[in-house]
Amino acid sequence: MTEHTDFELLELATPYALNAVSDDERADIDRRVAAAPSPVAAAFNDEVRAVRETMAVVSAATTAEPPAHLRTAILDATKPEVRRQSRWRTAAFASAAAIAVGLGAFGLGVLTRPSPPPTVAEQVLTAPDVRTVSRPLGAGTATVVFSRDRNTGLLVMNNVAPPSRGTVYQMWLLGGAKGPRSAGTMGTAAVTPSTTATLTDLGASTALAFTVEPGTGSPQPTGTILAELPLG
């Protein structure tokens, strides 16, 4: 029997979180998580929670449900006889993207008129190289779903306290020849229990970092890095 690695187990967190596994596969994953070293099990559970929180926020803007045959077709691609680890993540995110962008509009006659351009969420979530990473940020979590192919990411912050008045959270793209690049700011009013933002032009950046900066932000980081999410 091929030995399972910790990396392979963590790769299964996304399809597990999105219910893109069978009952037998879910039971097997549960057994592996229970037997895994505590840091690995904690990392698995953190990613499952982050993916579910992220998709809940991204999909909250629509109440449309995708047609049943679409989800069936997507999940058929993850059957054991044809599945590969790299395809699990793509298929699972494709299923989630269908919910997030409201593909249930097919039932409303969208096929009779030109399709709207894909949203940023759709572009990222359906990318072949989509990845997700999550880290604590204060008492909450910050999650980035990103695609190098699309050069774009989606940031979701859950249960992060707003910055103090007169300051902002500032996001920084780290790495690359130009050093830290500002990826935007969030003031007190912009931070809610579930906050989303789009990250564009990821370029050669290797991480997304957060600092607290005075006023409306700084040209370069001046505060302590509160969280750093790898984008490798």
UniProtKB/Swiss-Prot annotation:
Interacts with ECF RNA polymerase sigma factor SigK; this inhibits the interaction of SigK with the RNA polymerase catalytic core and leads to a decreased expression of SigK-regulated genes, such as mpt70 and mpt83. Belongs to the anti-sigma-K factor family. This is Anti-sigma-K factor RskA. It is found in: Cell membrane. It is a single-pass membrane protein. GO terms for molecular function: sigma factor antagonist activity. The keyword NADP does not apply. The modification N-acetylthreonine is found at residue 2. One of its GO terms (cellular component) is peptidoglycan-based cell wall. An anti-sigma factor for extracytoplasmic function (ECF) sigma factor SigK. ECF sigma factors are held in an inactive form by an anti-sigma factor until released by regulated intramembrane proteolysis (RIP). RIP occurs when an extracytoplasmic signal triggers a concerted proteolytic cascade to transmit information and elicit cellular responses. InterPro entries: Anti-sigma-K/W_factor, Anti_sigma_zinc_sf, RskA_C, RskA_N. The cytosolic domain interacts with sigma factor SigK. Residues 2-90 are cytoplasmic. GO terms for biological process: regulation of translation. The chain crosses the membrane at residues 91-111. The keyword Ligase does not apply. Residues 112-232 are extracellular. It comes from Mycobacterium tuberculosis (strain ATCC 25618 / H37Rv). Its main location: membrane. Pfam families: RskA_C, RskA_N.
